[in-house]
Amino acid sequence: MAQQQQQQHQQQQHHQQQQQLLLQQQQQLLQYNNNLYNLNYNMEDNERRKRREREKYERQQGIQSDDRETSLFGEPRRLNPSEGDAEITAALGEFIDARDHMNSSTVGIYRHASTNASSSRLPALSFGGSSLANSYSTSSASVNPAASLASSSASVPGQLPTSQQQQQQQQQQQHYQQQQRAPTYLKQADNKPPYNGRGGYPGQPMKNDIPSSSGMAPPRGPPRSSSSASQSNSNSNSINSSSATNNATSGATSASMSSPLGPPLSTQMPNGREKSFLGPPAPALPNGGRFVPPAASSKRPSNSVGLQPPPPEKDISKIITEMTNNYRVTPLTSIAATPHAPMSENYNLNGPNKFKYAFDSIGPLNSPPAAGASSLMTPLLAPIAPITSPIAPLLTTPPQASQLPLPLAPLAGATTVPPALGGMAAVAPIQQLMPTPPKASPTPPAIKPMKTEKNHSLEKQDSCLENDLELSESDDERKKEGRSAGNSSNSSESDSSESGSEASSKGDTQQQQQQQQQQQQQQLLLQQQQQQQLLLQQQQQRLAASANGSKKKYSQTIIASGANTISGLLTSSGLGGAGAGSVAGGAGGAGGAINATNNTCGGGGGSSGSCMGTMSSSSSSNKTPSPTDSNRWNLSRFFPKPANQTAAESVSPGVANAIGNVSMKVPGILPGGAQIIPESIDVTTAIVKNEKLHDEPRHVGDDEDDEADEQHRQQQQQQQQQQQQQQQQQRYGLSVTVKKEQLEQQQQQQLLLQQQQQLTTEQLALAGALPKNQIKRESRLSDSGSASSGSGSGSSSSDSAGGSSEVLQMPGPGETLQIPGVPAAITTVLRVPQAMQHKVQPNSVTLTPIGPLPASPKPRQKKPRKKKMSAATAPLDSSDEDEPTASSNKKHALELAATAAAAAAAVAVPVAAAAAPAIKKGRGRPRKQAQQQQQQQQQQLQQSGNLSSASASSSQAKGPTLTAAKKPLAKASVSNSNSTAPATVAAGTRKREHSSNSSSNSNTPTKKPTATFATMAAKLDRADALSSDDDSSSSSSCSSTKSSSSSGSDSETPAAAAAGAAASTATTVVTTSAQNPAKKRIVKINKVGVAGNSSSSSKAKRRYSVGSSSNSSSSSETEEQQQHKQQQLLLLQQQQQKQQLQHQQQLQQQQQQQQSLLGQFAAESLPQSAQRLSSSDCSSSSNSDSSSNSSGSSSSSDEDGEHRSGKRKSDKKKICTLTRIFNPKEGGAKKQGQVVIIDQSEEQQQQQQQQQQQAKELKPRATPTQLLGATLASPARTTTPHLTSLMCKIDLSKLARQHHHQPERLKAQQNGHLSSRSAEGARTPKDLQQICTPNGYVGGAAGGGAAASKLLGGVKHEHGVKPEPELEPGYEGKYKLNSVKQEFMLKQELPARRRKRSSSSSSSPYKEKKRKKEKAEQLSKELLPVPVLLPANNHERLSRDKLELLMQQQESAANGSPNKLQQQQQQSRLSQSQQQQQQQQQQQSLSQSTTAAATVAAAPIQLPTTCSEAVQTTPPPAAPQPEPRLIYRSHFDKEEENENDDLRKNDFLLQEAIRRKRAADSERDSFSQMTLYLEAIVYFLLTADAMERCNMEATWTMYKDTLSLIKYISSKNRPYQLSTNGNHESHNIVAILSLRCQSLISLKLYKLRRVNCRAIIASCTEFFRSGRGDILNGNTPSSISPSNSVGSQGSGSNTPPGKIVPQDIHNMLCKQNEYLTYVNSAHELWDQADRLVRNGNHIDFIRKLDHENGPLTLHSTMHEVFRYVQAGLKTLRDAVSYPQSQ
């Protein structure tokens, strides 16, 4: 006994000595901290204030000083943290952790360690080397009486430590330390929070309820001593952790206890903020307190058990083992960086991989590690287990943990659950967190401080934004917390940190307790679910492995490890087959797969699985942030998890990785929430930034590779889809799968069916993530390519994202969200019923939605040129997709669309072989071997299932839009009703269109006729099908945004033509167009000969049938319309044939080539509009368009020479229009003079045509090259004699847009929005007298399409005409009923080229054409240099041409026969001029009515009678026609568009806005950041606009906060505006758009308060009028003694004369000033923007943007602002990302 007592006494003495050493060390540390604080906080108030202000300003400006960062923040942080930073912090963290671990373990402080473990580790304390660790242990002990086991025991040698003794000891230590502190810092604890509670003095307790601020300025006051903290908060580690975080020691303990992942307590400010001191606290806490040494808890248990002799040195070996295990387990891998990537930064979706390592959800930490969570992790678990169990309770209390706004359930749950689950269970999740051992070793609550830390740095910057917007991310956090405990910690923490985890710090203890309970429950669930998920994931991983095994070598392999969630995300992202296997796990990944989403496709579900580009071109699919982007997974937070999804599911992504050995090469989320993002994944990275790069090499370099990839993808997709269907049928796979070149039609159909089955709300929800991914890409690249394929599934993923039922209720599976002003990815193609797609014949091309957000850079378009050579499908994609790397994107898009379209158009696939899309190498150049290539490509298309999927993917790139229903360009034979040769040509043209469109913001592919080897009949059929398809697509999209959808269909028309699938595909297009939001560009369906093999009748039928049947609804109408139109067409064709047989053959040759393109486009535009129209509308449009359609069909059917001649008349008008449009002098065709009009006297032309008609053989249409060559050879009068139709390469996008909008069906569809600028419309043949629109705008929409195709014969394609800004589909209908043509005409400054436009604009019906014939020479001579001056205003640019077009349509409907037209043309010049004037007047009236009706009457533009006159470089003699009369479009015309708002979209829009803002917060590139911010702004505006119908006050708040946000953003952009770097112009344009937005927001704020302002003005007016109020004279005392009067002086004696204003009046005046200030600001900001446009020489850019999207005025709605800004940003991204391809 005596010996035992002696031993005990010795032990006690030893402990006392150790404690004394620890106290000394603590004192030293405190003194050191005090010195640091003295440096930082002992400054004078003024100095501190100045410094805080300066730092705040710097943070706002994105300026960061390293020294200041180091002193202010736990780790240097950037607004856009870099991966390098993450690595550095991770490396430091590990080192610190190791050091801390060694110190603490040597000291023997294991707070949670069992008594045995602690006792075993106590001997380490005996070593002097562990002084630091001892100091930590003492501080920790002092902080928490429960935790101060070791310290108290050591302090009382002879007694077992009691909480009182411990407290006393702690108090003594604190006093001792405080005495040593400099008196300057010492402030007696008066229970008053210093600095209003912002900071605490060392001895001063902190208010625990003070929310941790984002830390704009470091808290004031010296760091609290650990002893003082322990005294004041001896019982609550949470309070101390927040208040005493400044003390390295106390902070260390509290941090270790409260939150292992939290920032070092020393770095935390007394008020709970993170001071982020890296230096001095580090010695105390190796990680600056962020990571509690795992050994810290060992000492505690020994104390609790009782004083025991220090364990033998063998514990040191244990410590070393633990060190090795822990730190080996958490190397500086992506996981290791986690501690530095706290949840708070998770919201930075675009943030660099710095956050890769951040644990997506803390909750998962508690969840048992996924199978093989990491073999490395496991060793940590054993040592950690003891730690975690004790820590868990502590974690609940520490304010740091509470600081995490998220319910710590996931965080604390990790530690808390361990007690419930057992130390090991808890440990396992921690181990997963352990990737940074410091995090793991401390309890997960430390994670909160971690997040808060990041939150501070990011949040300091975000706080301005998010707080200004009052996004109430805390609400988001709550919602997220509700979703699943596992994910809640992840999302809520990041959100809370984002929202500025200030409020979250309140009630931390309660939250922690609740969280612990939740965590325990969640952990149990997680364990169960993880076990299940491990099985599923293993299976899925196998599937993913197979999928990855396929040639899909891009991120698929990476994603494969992601197992369920990743594969599911990939599938949902539309990576269809390739990613399907990997996606299988997490189809609904939005919820549980959120983490997986992070891994898979950056940003919640990789949205559209773009992350790995599982689609044929993974790179393109990776438009969405690649998994390498650590922040990508953060997007998942925004996606509501499936209700059934448990927290375990959230862990599942990590589990997938955990299942096997943790592979750092495979993206995944460990159970702890740590995300493994392989940085080495080039595919993902490349995909993110240069999708086209990956795709292009494949497309350009290796068609075989593409095919092989496609085959692999197809196989993978099939397998994956099957698996997914089995696992999750609801998972939406993209309706479009990977290219299925080799897949059979049945396989395609099956895939489509599977995909459709998979199209579910979850899929849509996942798609919601797609915009996020696209956002990141959009910042750097136009998202066109990767977004399209990435969205390939494209459109479905982003569409589903836009329309995901979870995120946003979708109008229908095939419908678009149809946000009135939103061209963005709001439509969901995924939901398109397969039946619809199957109904659409495979020849049809799906719509390419106009993605408002992603702007495919034009450079990519150039790249598509290369790719175009490699594959025909690529060209289609490029045109569809709006990205410069169209070809790469094209492949993906084609693959995606091919997948969906292959199934839908399985029947068409065989047909597709018949026609091969003519591929154009250059943007404007057709391939010389277009026909052969087309044939080959068509065959390839059959194999690869090339659909207009490219357009679909491109639409996604442009924004979530419908993708297609595009069907593989299956063109069995030209003769077949499904003859698709023209379609393939259309595909080629579509590429061109895409390239040009990509240049323009909307995806309005420049439609360029490509020579089609197909026969005339096929061309005619195609033209009809195309026109009908375009109409249908435009009409369907018109529902949301008629004009945009119309132009979208127009833009896609080439793709449809390229698809050139059977006319029946029009239904698909219609469906897709319906799906497409109005804003989105619809890919025109190339309906080749659906209705009739006979060229004329079947053409008419097809056109009408396609137009009407493009949608199931229009199918019934199509029959009637087809019959009616066929009759009209027959009549018109007969007349035209009689009259224009002469013009036929040459025109036929050229037109056959061009008609295959333009005709298809025109036809497509017609059917699309018809689709939109109700059956009655369709029938009426067909009736009105009957003449135009007949002419169009005749033109489209090259077989009908008569029809051609008839159309040629209209073609003359169109040629005139086109000539003006395309004459470089007139500014047409980008002022490149790309349109060559053959201008011969009509008589000569007629003679030639007669001769040709005599030789009436249908000559194969010249290849685009031939046409171009002919045109180039003789621009004025090359080949076609009478046909004045331009042989020009008219921007198909322009014409197609117009043509789409022109169909009379469009009248009803467009609601007065005439956006019928399509290549077809421009080329409307004479037969389409009604349709003939001078600018190629479809006068009669249906007829216009056919006429346009005829014009193509007459028009040579020199260079793809770049789509004019007006061509934007979204805006065309809206802004340009006929004005688009006018604008083009006006835009083309052809002073030399005889702006016959002016006459043409005045030209009403074909009477003008007669006049033109008579006046041809005179007019050509007189008007040679007559340039049509573009009015300064875009509205002014709407020229009389619109009216003329309307008149022409009406007249053509009335005067359907070409004979009448010719007669009218034969009328005397006087009569013609009179008629023109009258017609112009009529047209104006009509335009007013039709504008509302959205009918586009193609008024024959009085142009030089011959095309040559219009086209000639030297102005040919042109009869002076009445000067162009500007048509001013009323802004009331566009009001109809915005009536379609769906309140269901409010939440989706808000989520999109938040995603983009967070992505911008983490973006490092200034330009990308500004564009993302601006995108977020417009989404906020759409949200506010939608809210306006419900809650005016909330709307006011939203607008006001948005204004504050945009002002803040603009302030950050100012330094770049004046810079001279290459981005100078782009930054200036961003500033212009920002100023426009600010102006309109200010005006909106005034309008919202206009009623109040009126009342105030009335009251104030009454007050001043009545003279109420006492008048104060300077010398006369007033009845009321002035406040400033001096007693000695007479009252008022010193008061200046004035009037006393009552308080109520004063308040009203203040309010009035506020409201009127908004008005003043609106105009002032608008003027600033105008000045910046002029001074910066951005007039051309803005003018183009106005033309394409409609002018932005103070009358513009928020939807229009959205479209306009999105289009501008898209164009900017294209220019910045791909300047070379511009």
From Swiss-Prot:
Biased amino acid composition, Basic and acidic residues: 54-80, 450-463, 691-701
DNA-binding region: 920-932
Gene Ontology CC annotations of this record: nucleus; super elongation complex
Keyword Phosphoprotein: yes
Region named Disordered: 42-84, 150-313, 434-515, 605-637, 691-732, 768-820, 839-891, 911-1064, 1091-1126, 1166-1234, 1296-1327, 1386-1420, 1450-1484, 1674-1701
Localization of this protein: Nucleus
Acidic residues: bias regions: 465-475
Keywords, in A-Z order: Developmental protein, DNA-binding, Nucleus, Pair-rule protein, Phosphoprotein, Transcription, Transcription regulation
Role according to the record: Has a role in transcriptional regulation. Acts in parallel with the Ras/MAPK and the PI3K/PKB pathways in the control of cell identity and cellular growth. Essential for regulation of the cytoskeleton and cell growth but not for cell proliferation or growth rate. Required specifically for the microtubule-based basal transport of lipid droplets. Plays a partially redundant function downstream of Raf in cell fate specification in the developing eye. Pair-rule protein that regulates embryonic cellularization, gastrulation and segmentation.
Record's protein name: AF4/FMR2 family member lilli
